[in-house]
Amino acid sequence: MTINFESQVVLVTGGTRGLGREFSLCLGASGATVAVNSTTSDDAGVIDTITGSGGQAAHFAALVERPDSLIEAVVERFGRLDAIIHNAGFVRDKTLRKMTDEQWQEVIDVHLSAAFKLTREAWPHFEAAGGGRIVFISSASGLYGNFGQSNYAAAKMGMYGLARSISMEGGRSNITCNCVAPVGATTMNSGHWSDRDKEIRKAEYVAPLVAYLAHSSCEESGSFFETSAGSYKKLRWERTEGLNLFPADSPVTIDTIAENWQTITNFELTEHPQSMADSLQRMYVRFDD
């Protein structure tokens, strides 16, 4: 199997530096027409690198927080849009107690709100193209939390709820949406890493997974992946079988919860709900007997 992006136009936000640069280069080398976005007019040599190897690419300077003109410019230039990789973003790290409203909102806007707005603006163009692929670049901070990053963690985990909803709404139109939490060595994050760590965590190693999720042949949707150092893993929800009572027969009190805490939190027996309906059905099934 050879994955080729010929005739597919892919927009990469934040596509000139760090991980975004690797996404752009990987796509360009695989035949995609790459719409490379950044906030400034400096494309950091990405366009020349892609076109110098025979690929097609153009740079679009725009703020992703206001994406209507960006999407319009890409479609006007290339005639279509097939996929978006939303990678643009920044951090404003502070402990929650010291974080300002502005520091909170800036991070929410560039990561989560922009993901929503980009998707909304691109939707009719995806439908016109017969489908679309959306990849949100999330973070392990969203999955696990991180000290001093309550804004960033909330935005990055919010992307997953958004992706799940998009995957449901987009199913009939062949529009998919997934999240990836990558870790790769970039100038921004690797200053304190050893040379060995930088070598095994090269940013280019995470790009193939992201690119595949953006390809028209990939039907995966509503999923969350982690990748670093050549590892590629899909996540799923897991919960305990927990405590399942019949409150109508025996009232449940705060003491009931406290006395059964080990049962509620014991992961020896688990469930893996796939949707809200599945989650609730597993809670209600015992009443069907």
Protein language model features and the residues they cover:
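Conserved glycine-rich cofactor-binding loop
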Residues: 16-17
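Substrate-binding pocket helix/loop in short-chain dehydrogenase/reductase
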Residues: 95-96, 103-108
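Active-site helix of classical SDR
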Residues: 119, 155, 163
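Conserved amphipathic alpha-helix within the SDR
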Residues: 51, 58-61, 65-79, 127
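C-terminal helical subdomain
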Residues: 197-288
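Conserved glycine-rich Rossmann-like NAD(P)H-binding loop of the short-chain dehydrogenase/reductase
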Residues: 30-45
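Residue(s) in the substrate-gating loop at a strand-loop-helix junction
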Residues: 139
